[in-house]
Amino acid sequence: METQELNNISSQVRRDIVRMVSGASSGHPGGSLGCADFLTLLYFEVLKHDPSNFDMDGKGEDVFYLSNGHISPVWYSVLARSGYFPVNELGTFRKLSTRLQGHPSTDKNIPGVRMASGSLGQGLSCALGTAVTKKLNGDSSLVYTLHGDGELQEGQIW
């Protein structure tokens, strides 16, 4: 993918973030906006994944865990823009009884989400467990995780 195309997607992701947080009058726009380029590059260029065939096991594909779940707006936007669910669902962010809440959750059956995040630091434990499992199963695909600076100073990581 060309750099300009990635820049265009990242710019759209930023617009999505502002719309979601503004529409909900709630959320964490700073961390989300700051990670737009990283997650865009990860999902559109680096990660080996198949949005049309998502399953919780992730066998034979790269896996991503968002540990600092409060930046869910950026992840929801990138997931939608890369084909995991319809982009128009972004308008339901933090609305009652919808899937896209302030922290991603597995009980909402959001394609692309393999871990409920909110307990700071647990993403590292899940990523390590997944990496060991992949290695034991002869699966050479990679595991990625993203953590916030604040969570690195508390919880399981600290």
Where in the sequence are the language-model features?
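Cofactor-binding active-site loop characterized by glycine-rich and histidine/acidic residues
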Residues: 17-20, 32-158
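N-terminal capping segment at the start of a domain
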Residues: 10-26
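Alpha-helix capping and helix-loop boundary segments enriched in small/acidic/polar residues
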Residues: 4-5, 26, 148-151
